[in-house]
Amino acid sequence: MKISIISFGSSPREWLGLYKKEINKIKQFKYQIEFINLSEHSQENIELKKMLETKDILQKIPKNSSCYLFTERGKTVTSKEFSQLLNFSNICFIIGGSYGVDEKLIAKSRPDIGFLSFGKLTFAHKIFKLIVLEQIYRGFSIKFNRKYHHAD
């Protein structure tokens, strides 16, 4: 069982220890974490850049994955609701590039992809990856009735 996280840019070395700590906590739930790091396009035209990067994302989505894109226009979910998304053996989370993604192209090419939001704040990719990992761990803790999550 695997969770893939597609994002742009590599992870800074000083953050790898934090990611590894979260990944090790998730492993107890029998899931592997795979980072798929893509390179941002240097295209100056923002709409073209988003389209090219979206095409790159679509090519990298693992087959037979339940897939979710993080976007500020996505559905805001509670930790409990997020835990219900973790009911598949292969899950893919997408973090778009610095200008986002071509959401129309995503919806047209893969209408099965869910759009999620963790609120209206904007985060650096390195921080958001850590937030996603923590929420995956929290979600599994809720799903398997572990004592990590204390809110209703």
Curated annotation (Swiss-Prot):
It catalyses: pseudouridine(1915) in 23S rRNA + S-adenosyl-L-methionine = N(3)-methylpseudouridine(1915) in 23S rRNA + S-adenosyl-L-homocysteine + H(+). GO terms for molecular function: rRNA (pseudouridine-N3-)-methyltransferase activity. It comes from the Bacteria. Its EC number is 2.1.1.177. Signal peptide: none annotated. It is found in: Cytoplasm. GO terms for cellular component: cytoplasm. S-adenosyl-L-methionine binds at residues 69, 96, 118-123. Homodimer. This is Ribosomal RNA large subunit methyltransferase H. It comes from Mesomycoplasma hyopneumoniae (strain J / ATCC 25934 / NCTC 10110) (Mycoplasma hyopneumoniae). The gene is rlmH.
